[in-house]
Amino acid sequence: MSSACDHETEASHVNIPETTPEENGSNSSTPTSEIGPACVVSPAPGETGAPPPKRRRPCGLPQGVALINTSVSTHPLFTTSCQSSWEDVEREFNIAPSWRPILEREMQQPYVRLLLNEYKLRCASEEVFPPKEDIFAWTRFSPPEKVRVVIVGQDPYHAPGQAHGLAFSVRKGVPVPPSLRNIYSAVQKSYPSFRHPMHGFLERWAEQGVLLINTTLTVARGKPGSHATLGWHRLVRAVIDRLCTTSQGLVFMLWGAHAQKSCSPNRQHHLVLTYGHPSPLSRVNFRDCPHFLEANAYLTKTGRKPVDWQIE
């Protein structure tokens, strides 16, 4: 590799003859070293030849420069949610007023505000099910004090036209999903007189106090589990915990590992039934699930009316 001196002109290379003290007219006995060809660089006027001091990186912002705050609180989609009253949220999401004692305090928590804002951001970039007005449809069929049975699902159906806010349910005119067909088969095994409905709308169950709720309340089209990290599970868990403390003798049907991990009612105060998931992909034959019979036996034993599982 070439050095800087290699690029100097030949005039820059001089031979300095070795001299002795006598030749210099000096009596000094200090030996001199031999100086070979050198690259002679004259310092600039005012310089001493020492290396220049290192430039330090400036700290802070230049004068007159200010950063724009991009935190959550200043995002236009966040501002509305953070300032919304319960009435605003109730109206926007079509929540039944009877659920205010269960939901109001939780809906004002910071994590719910972030959750709803993230939901709005997702809606701006992808198709989300169910429609916003149906996310809390599970509140509109029975007030909290009338809930007797809680069936916990995972997340909504992800195909167009299926999800409408009730776990495992689809509206009339929509083909009955395989999981719901297996649920119907389990009911029929416990109640031979049960007739398989031609539709999958579970409204009649919900009106009798069967809470059909998913742990995740929204999903992106064609992407099951895509909204599992938004925070819905925390809100649903709070709702279930609140129901457990305000009611006695609830029946919980927890199907599959996900439901069983996300919900842990006090077994001393409530009946907790567990089984495999009704999905056809489950290793367990859901047709043998006895929960519908066991739930009614428990309700009757505790002096309450059993659920009529027949759907017209």
UniProtKB/Swiss-Prot annotation:
Q: What class of enzyme is it?
A: hydrolase
- Residue ranges of coiled coil: none
Does tRNA-binding appear among the keywords? no
- What is the catalytic activity of this protein? Hydrolyzes single-stranded DNA or mismatched double-stranded DNA and polynucleotides, releasing free uracil
Its GO CC terms are: host cell nucleus
Q: Which domain of life is it from?
A: Viruses
SUPFAM superfamilies, alphabetized: Uracil-DNA glycosylase-like
List the HAMAP family.
UDG
Q: Which family does it belong to?
A: Belongs to the uracil-DNA glycosylase (UDG) superfamily. UNG family.
Q: Please report the name of this protein according to its UniProt entry.
A: Uracil-DNA glycosylase
Species of provenance: Equine herpesvirus 1 (strain Ab4p)
